[in-house]
Amino acid sequence: MHTINSPDVPSAHAIREQLRAGSEIHVRGHVTHKHHKDFSVELLSGPHIVLHVNFRFEHDHIVAMNTCTNGAWGAEIRHHNPLKHHDHFNLSIHVHEGYYHISVNGEHLADFPHRFPVESVQAIGLKGAAHIDEISFSGFEFGVDWNSQHDFGHAGYNSYGTETYVAPVFQETHSYNAYF
């Protein structure tokens, strides 16, 4: 298992090995309502959002799930948001063949179909109105040092989750271009 303790929000963190069926990601924290009215956990691949899980609190009290490729959003899938202001949560993303099984505090929230290959995921992004205590990863081989530098094949996710963020673009020869 690999754990990231007290990551900043917003931030993006490398997932050093490819996702596969059996991989699990757990994000533990609590809801805050500072200047944001929602928070998101995203699985990222270069300029693409492979999985967007957005907890909304202001107008629609929902969890919206989606994907985004080259700035174009797919069809949004909505579910009831089980969280309220200051609630503690454990968001679990379990990778299965063909879908992500997503639960909150041990309760099934949704199954979201893979719209892009899970092998394309490079990072997890956190942004919005949440304090995150830890992110934990299990079900990987852990054959590399997850704390070392990572070559994304692009400039990385600098300033992810801020107004100045510009999504990175894969280098022309990078193998991940084949996924999109």
Swiss-Prot record:
Coiled coil: none annotated. GO terms for molecular function: carbohydrate binding; galactoside binding; glycolipid binding. Disulfide bonds: none annotated. Residues 11-138 form the Galectin domain. InterPro entries: ConA-like_dom_sf, Galectin-like, Galectin_CRD. Pfam families: Gal-bind_lectin (PF00337). Keywords: Lectin. PROSITE patterns: GALECTIN (PS51304). GO terms for biological process: defense response to Gram-positive bacterium; endoplasmic reticulum unfolded protein response; IRE1-mediated unfolded protein response; response to toxic substance. The keyword Acyltransferase does not apply. This is Probable galaptin lec-8. One of its GO terms (cellular component) is cytoplasmic vesicle. SUPFAM superfamilies: Concanavalin A-like lectins/glucanases. The lineage of its organism: Eukaryota, Metazoa, Ecdysozoa, Nematoda, Chromadorea.
